[in-house]
């Protein structure tokens, strides 16, 4: 029985045993007897107002939350999976780790001919972030998007001889497109109290390209982001995201988040983009098929043409799809049903103070703390959940410091989709290091904050003006996520 329900039996018992109030007579009231004792009117019982249950801020992913602070925190199944649904998740887990090899082969055949990596897990180790670029080495989980222009309706225009992604590896006997190298500049910035911090600025260079780079080549570096929680983000109703948008800054708060509208390669329709660092993918299915296609050179029914089409590396064999629809479906379900790590230390006074500061300096204007998912029949485990992702899934101008100057559909060269912050405090535990932002340049959360510009410049300057104790509290809050 609910704590808010009245017991009928108890109410009757109470009525039978109550004495006459204010009469000085302790004799029981008799109901329906012959004694002639008057029956006193029953005092109306006012129903209690139900109390809304207190929100448990630990439950970042609602019913999909996992209570793990280990290195496996990002790769744990949602706890509300069971039976055949859990089996399907585990099948997707196997496919996520499968390594593709050069054709012909009995399994996982069709790698390349040019590619960046050979499996999902190598770009997303432990289902988390990839590694930032390192000078003078073969890059493992960072790549360059390339193009020579952009049509807001149809998207980036492929670079002749290089397509839409620079692929630095190739199968035996085939020439890769070249190599990517990086150098870092250290830029010192100072807080109002005199403390300093060094910001690492990457400068990427294409070397040993197999042919001359085309004039006007646009490039943008991408480090693979974490993959957990994406099913919940996919289940946020489009109306909710549109309600967060404020493209013309009608409320005059300096924040003008807007949506990206991109072509769905399955239907051909233009739809809301919500995945990818510039919100250029309409669904997880499309994003995953795109990763097979561009990152691994593996074709599918969604992207049936080799990524090297029109180049000297093109494989002219008329192969069937190299990854099956079933595998794409299983990998998509796997990503949709990964659990979200629980928040920690939610009642700690320092964390609570940092949470208040997070709102006060208006970080929460873009990193919206909570959302509710809608109906999602394909994956009911993520439907109708109160979640705490800290994102609005919108594009925001982040200023020239973070700009790659490569537009993508409606996204300008300085706009980025707000990344979710859930789980960010466990990054070092899972990945063994801290590297943040779209290209992994930030080695700490404070570095990431101080790179914010554009719409976030005012918030950054408010953080700069904080005393060290307040900055520490802000970081304590972020570490609790």
Locate each region found by the language model:
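Bacterial N-terminal signal peptides that target proteins for export
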Residues: 1-10
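C-terminal motif of bacterial Sec signal peptides marking the signal peptidase cleavage site
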Residues: 18-20
């Amino acid at each position: 029985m609910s704590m808010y329900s009245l017991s009928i039996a108890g109410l009757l018992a109470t009525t039978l045993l109550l004495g006459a109030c204010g009469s000085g007579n302790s004799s029981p009231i008799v109901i329906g007897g012959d004694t002639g004792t008057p029956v006193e009117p029953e005092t109306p019982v006012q129903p209690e107002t139900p109390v809304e249950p207190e929100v448990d801020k630990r439950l970042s992913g609602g019913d999909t939350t996992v209570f793990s602070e280990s290195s496996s925190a990002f790769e744990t199944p949602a706890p509300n999976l069971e039976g055949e649904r859990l089996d399907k998740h585990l099948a997707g887990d196997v496919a996520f780790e499968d390594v593709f090899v050069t054709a012909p082969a009995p399994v996982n055949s069709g790698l390349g001919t040019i590619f960046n990596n050979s499996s999902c897990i190598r770009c997303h180790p432990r289902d988390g972030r990839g590694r930032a670029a390192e000078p003078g080495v073969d890059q493992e989980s960072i790549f360059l998007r390339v193009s020579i222009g952009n049509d807001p309706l149809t998207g980036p225009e492929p670079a002749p001889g290089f397509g839409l992604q620079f692929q630095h590896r190739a199968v035996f006997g085939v020439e890769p497109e070249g190599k990517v190298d990086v150098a870092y500049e250290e830029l010192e910035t100072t807080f109002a109290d005199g403390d300093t911090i060094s910001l690492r600025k990457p400068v990427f260079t294409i070397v040993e390209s197999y042919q001359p780079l085309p004039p006007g080549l646009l490039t943008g570096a991408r480090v693979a982001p974490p993959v957990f929680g994406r099913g919940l983000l996919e289940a946020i109703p489009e109306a909710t995201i549109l309600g967060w948008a404020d493209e013309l800054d009608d409320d005059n708060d300096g924040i003008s988040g807007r949506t990206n509208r991109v072509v769905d390669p399955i239907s051909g329709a233009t739809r809301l983009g919500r995945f990818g660092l510039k919100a250029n993918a309409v669904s997880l299915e499309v994003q995953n098929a795109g990763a097979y296609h561009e990152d691994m050179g593996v074709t599918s029914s969604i992207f049936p043409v080799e990524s090297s089409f029109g180049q000297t590396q093109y494989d002219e064999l008329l192969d069937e799809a190299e990854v099956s629809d079933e595998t794409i479906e299983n990998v998509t379900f796997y990503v949709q049903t990964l659990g979200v790590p629980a928040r920690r230390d939610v009642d700690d006074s320092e964390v609570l103070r940092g949470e208040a500061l997070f709102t006060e300096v208006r970080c929460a204007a873009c990193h919206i703390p909570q959302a509710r998912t809608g109906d999602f029949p394909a994956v009911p485990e993520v439907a109708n959940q109160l979640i705490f992702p800290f994102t609005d899934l919108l594009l925001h101008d982040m200023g020239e410091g973070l700009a790659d100057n490569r537009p993508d559909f409606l996204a300008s060269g300085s706009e980025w989709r707000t990344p979710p912050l859930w789980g960010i405090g466990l990054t070092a535990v899972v990945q063994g290091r801290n590297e943040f932002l779209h290209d992994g340049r930030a080695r700490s959360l404070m570095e990431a904050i101080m790179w914010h510009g554009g719409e976030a410049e005012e918030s950054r300057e408010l953080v700069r003006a904080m005393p060290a104790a307040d900055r520490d509290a802000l970081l304590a809050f972020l570490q609790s996520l």
